[in-house]
Regions:
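N-terminal presequence-like segments and the immediate start of the first folded domain
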Residues: 3-9, 14-75, 79-92, 98-144
Length: 144
């Protein structure tokens, strides 16, 4: 009896596994590639998870001006959203990583211009250093 139940459960999982895989889509904006071993975005069941986006352009350059760096990070997020046929209005959660708390007000002004009401939830964390040379990295989750 126990073996029969186990067999049924295993069979059900094997049948369901392709359905889960079929709903997963890797999102890569045209003309870009991730800077490491990760996906820029993963869309699964209508939810888009975007990896941390730094303020660097497609050539890997980071603007000297912090405001331009923030805008570039948000533009990079916008490119992933667009590739997934979403907009900033679909974003439900944001995590911002800054290397300097004194730059929070400037980041916040630019952020406020990008995300309109109702704004997504947000956590902002000050870190000692990012993996790359930038001063900001932003991760978002969006839902259609």
């Amino acid at each position: 009896m126990h073996t029969t139940k186990l067999t049924i459960v295993v069979a059900a999982l094997l049948v369901a596994a392709p359905a889960f895989a079929a709903d997963l889509k890797i999102i890569v904006p045209p003309g870009t590639k991730p800077g490491g071993n990760y996906s820029q975005g993963i869309l699964i069941d209508g939810t888009l998870y975007i990896s941390g986006q730094a303020g660097e352009d497609a050539a890997g350059r980071i603007p000297a001006d912090f405001g331009a760096e923030v805008k570039q990070a948000l533009d990079n997020i916008g490119a992933v959203l667009k590739a997934a046929e979403m907009t900033p209005a679909d974003v439900v959660s944001v995590q911002v990583y800054l290397t300097d708390a004194a730059r929070f007000p400037q980041m916040n002004v630019i952020y406020t211009g990008y995300f309109k009401e109702p704004r997504p939830t947000r956590t902002t964390v000050v870190v000692a250093k990012l993996v790359g040379p930038g001063n900001i990295e932003i991760t978002v989750t969006a839902r259609k």
